[in-house]
């Protein structure tokens, strides 16, 4: 495998070393972009191992920061494309990895930049900035750009993604993600494993694309958003805002769901409801 040749020496396990690098580059971690550095090497290795990178696979990394994960990834992949929004971090990444043939740096917002990139890739990785995690995942699903992904996100969001039917965390986002991916929890990570230490816990999830039979994604997405906007109301009181032909409410296929709240309807049932409603349009 290809080895990374560092032009800068950062000890990613040392808060002192990280602080020194940030001081030299006049960088302060920004909460806006979720800039917290994972300083536990064992956890970093475990996360990368969960990607199960095969030889010749091409990887995207979103928000590499100082490059702790990037350094490991470059030893395992023939091509790593890294998207970094912060220009000062981009400068560090260029200094460290810019001469490597298997490294490509894209400067700017991932959501704006990725549509212009070659999408012939195998997997996506990120310690996603907490404030954009749901946006990134939703956008990739909406664009039907479904790849095997390993994301570290705020535990609160991970709990929504992995939620079971009939639970308080079961939401439209749960249904959106689980309708497109098999979700596997890799590890929970306490705040003490980061610098600066966040007040919240993090969770690493693996998302594996799965086949679905959603006939009209826009209608499906609109349906789940509509009914979960009033999650305590029964379906008969919320679905009326979604359908145009009220006669559909008298159809047998809907009757078993009308007195249920959205949190009591499974992912598969939402797909069935959406597909049937689509057929009536």
Swiss-Prot record:
Family statement drawn from the similarity comment of this UniProt entry? Belongs to the class I-like SAM-binding methyltransferase superfamily. rRNA adenine N(6)-methyltransferase family. RsmA subfamily.
According to UniProt, the reaction catalysed is: adenosine(1518)/adenosine(1519) in 16S rRNA + 4 S-adenosyl-L-methionine = N(6)-dimethyladenosine(1518)/N(6)-dimethyladenosine(1519) in 16S rRNA + 4 S-adenosyl-L-homocysteine + 4 H(+)
Entry keyword set:
Cytoplasm, Methyltransferase, RNA-binding, rRNA processing, S-adenosyl-L-methionine, Transferase
Regions crossing the membrane: none
What main location does UniProt list?
A: cytoplasm
Top-level lineage group: Bacteria
Does the keyword rRNA processing feature in the UniProt annotation? yes
GO cellular component terms listed in the entry, alphabetical order? cytosol
PROSITE patterns xrefs: RRNA_A_DIMETH, SAM_RNA_A_N6_MT
EC primary class: transferase
Q: Which SUPFAM superfamilies match?
A: S-adenosyl-L-methionine-dependent methyltransferases
Any Pfam family matching the protein: RrnaAD
Mind giving the lineage of the organism this protein is from? Bacteria, Pseudomonadati, Spirochaetota, Spirochaetia, Spirochaetales
UniProt: S-adenosyl-L-methionine binding residues: 36, 38, 63, 84, 109, 127
Quick one: which gene encodes this?
Answer: rsmA
Q: Repeat: is it a keyword of this entry? A: no
Family annotation (InterPro entries): KsgA/Erm, rRNA_Ade_diMease-like_C, rRNA_Ade_Mease_Trfase_CS, rRNA_Ade_methylase_Trfase_N, rRNA_adenine_dimethylase, SAM-dependent_MTases_sf
* Subcellular locations according to the entry: Cytoplasm
Q: Give the EC number(s) listed in the UniProt record.
A: 2.1.1.182
List the PANTHER family.
DIMETHYLADENOSINE TRANSFERASE, DIMETHYLADENOSINE TRANSFERASE-RELATED
Do you know which HAMAP family this protein is assigned to?
16SrRNA_methyltr_A
Q: What is this protein called?
A: Ribosomal RNA small subunit methyltransferase A
Query: What is the stated purpose of this protein?
Result: Specifically dimethylates two adjacent adenosines (A1518 and A1519) in the loop of a conserved hairpin near the 3'-end of 16S rRNA in the 30S particle. May play a critical role in biogenesis of 30S subunits.
Name the Gene Ontology molecular function terms of this record: 16S rRNA (adenine(1518)-N(6)/adenine(1519)-N(6))-dimethyltransferase activity; RNA binding
